[in-house]
Amino acid sequence: MKLENKNTIGFVGAPWTLLVYMINQQSPKKNVKKNFFDDEYLINRILLIIEKFLKIHIKNQVENGANVIQIFDSWAGLLEERDYPNFIYTPTLNLVNYVKSLNIPVICFPRDIKNYKEFCEIVKPDAVNIDYNVDPLTIQKNIKIPVQGGLDPKILLTDQENLKKETLKYLDIFKDHPYIFNLGHGILPETKPEMVEYLIKTIKDY
């Protein structure tokens, strides 16, 4: 489906995050089966298989109208920095290069990663989505590519005054930087629709 004058963003989970869900069989917020992850050889083999099928999924989305692809690594923060090269950088870079080979821009979201600057330098996405635990000023100073996101979804559970304050903070910090306003993670189920409407109005009125 192609929409005139609109970008259609396709998305996939990053290989590491999909592996976590496959092995854990649930959200790993409370329970992570860590013993499995000691077998580095097995992990790398599975990541390659996941990567193969993700490329098929990406191609299908592009052929059906997606003109941007976003890669979500929701559980990047589970890893120690020493594990980033094998489990995050290499598999994600392979996907980024594949998306670019289709002449499609790619956004990456390595949630809770400890070094966004290093990630961007190695993986080379066209834009990066940041989470709400990172300092936006540090990102603005250190990241040269377009930035997306950052606002804590819990802010939408407060009041309009607080929501406007936090929203304007991000808009002010990134006013001279290519920036796509978004949340620093998914919207929470209990969020009131009128708060989302107020957020959108605040952004449009800026």
PLM regions with names:
Residues 1-206:
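Active-site loop segments of alpha/beta catalytic cores
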